[in-house]
Structure formats: C-alpha cells, structure tokens
C-alpha cells in the first residue's frame, strides 16, 4: 500500500493514477470534503499552461483530473486531517489522523500543496445562515450572477478579477474595501472602472440583513471605517474575498522530521526524494533547484514520486513504468476509445 496525503492535482493525477499504472494500491487522504486541492479556489479561471491541453476553465481540467486520478480505484478518505507520519521501520509507515485513525503503508507521498487552505470568513453575526445560499467565498460559476446586483468585499487581485468578469453579465457590481485604495493591480482597477463597477474605499460590511425566513441575504449594511456612517443597500449576492487562512502544521509537528526549505517547503534532493527514505513530496510542497510551481510540474513530480516509491517498495522493479499507449492495462479501454473515433 502506498499512502498519498493530499488530493490536489499532484496527489490525484500521478501519485494516484501513475501509482496505479505501476500496479500499486493507493490510499489517498485529504482534509477537504472534495478532491481538487487549490484548483477548487479558481474554478472559472482559464488555464493556459498545461502542455497539450487547450485553454479551458479550471473546473473542466479538474473534472478530467479527478476522473483520471480515480481510474485505478484508489481508497479515498475525505474530511480527514493527517496530524502525524511515523516511520516504524523500512517499508513500514504509520499515518495518524486528527480523529485517531492510524493507517499503515509501505511508503508515503506528501502532496499537500501550500497546506490546508480555507477562505477567510466574514466576521459578522449570523453569517453561517447564508453560506449555502447567496453568500460566496469562491465563485463557482459566473452565470449565476447574470442580471444580479452583486456586492464584493475585498480589494485584492482576486476581488478585482471577479468584479471584472462578473460585471459583464451582472446588473450591477459594487466592491467595498477597508483601505484608501485597492491593493490589486492598477491596470485591473482601470478595467473594472471602465465596466461601471462601483468602488467604495474605506468601507466594510457591518451587518447582513436576511429575508423573512432568514435563508438569503436581502440587504447589506455598509459602514465607513473612519466616520462610522452607515447605509443599507439591497443585493442579490454577496462575495467575500478577504484572502485565505493557511495551515501547514503537519510538517512542523510530525514525528518524521524532514529537511525543510525556508521552513515552509519540504527540501527535495534534485527530485521528489526527501531526507527520509520512503517519504516523497510532490507539487507545491516540495522545493528543489529545478522546481517550477505549475500544474504541469505537479504532474511530473507525481510521476517521479510514484516511480521512486515503486522501487523503494519493490527494489527489483523497473525504475519507470511503460508509456500508456503501449500499456497492457489499457488494452480493453483502448478498444472502446478507438471504436468511438472510427465509427
């Protein structure tokens, strides 16, 4: 059994898929309720820099990545936070979760990206009532804002990006932020202004006013941060873009102390090998001299880690697997695909 910690692109596509290709059984653990990692934060953004993949929204790439990552039916555990990794002996590791579950494996791949990432929550009384309706921390689809009056709280690049894209289809877009000026790119500020986005500096959300059954936000009380002046405005949807809380305590608190780079990334030794044999790191969490932080690089890292894990678990195994076009495991699936394209 190979243990993969993290369900983002690196952990999914190659630490899971490629390990299956190499005839390894895989257990994948992720702290989130859904697979995808950081890619779920920007589902509508267009991804251009994956070789051989035409530019398309991130959520479409993620859908294919998850499908491929689950091809060999890995054992998937969601909503489980790993708190410790222990090497008991060669090819004998224990991974413990916050709930006290202990999983054993012969090798471990760490693919946790920048750690646990969650959007910073709006600090307003009763906010939790609206999180399943019209209060959003991530924009899943621009279409839902068509002909709507939309409020965005935040002055960074993400807030301005959303304002720019949503303004093209919404009835109105208002952006509030605490500072005198937005912190996002000046060029983007000009673009949103040209789209008649209303920018409200030194303004914050003070209260959310619900509808009769308190399931949807109907109005927002806005407050000037200096004067304290307040006014109430009707909005159909409210989007919060206050940044993210990041947690990466696993690497600092684990029993298996790995060599680190700048105290925040695992030090890789020219590849995905770490300072502890049998533990590998891939994706954004690993650093080495040739590292580039791209989705495409995460895929490559995952394949490298899976190959190294294979030869660690089975020393007489080939260093690399067969290319997929000639792999026996896809023989029947290839027939279906060929017939689909020929007839």
Swiss-Prot record:
Keyword vocabulary terms for this entry: FAD, Flavoprotein, NADP, Oxidoreductase
Pfam families: Pyr_redox_2 (PF07992)
Residues given in the record as FAD binding sites: 10, 30, 38, 42, 82, 117, 284, 325
MF terms in GO: ferredoxin-NADP+ reductase activity; flavin adenine dinucleotide binding; NADP binding
The enzyme's E.C. designation: 1.18.1.2
Gene3D superfamilies cross-referenced by the UniProt entry: FAD/NAD(P)-binding domain (3.50.50.60)
Source superkingdom: Bacteria
Signal peptide: none
Cofactor(s) demanded: FAD
Reactions performed catalytically: 2 reduced [2Fe-2S]-[ferredoxin] + NADP(+) + H(+) = 2 oxidized [2Fe-2S]-[ferredoxin] + NADPH
Binding note for cofactor: Binds 1 FAD per subunit.
Annotated InterPro entries: FAD/NAD-bd_sf, FAD/NAD-binding_dom, Fd--NADP_Rdtase_type_2, Ferredoxin-NADP_redctase_2
Assembly: Homodimer.
Homology family: Belongs to the ferredoxin--NADP reductase type 2 family.
Protein name: Ferredoxin--NADP reductase
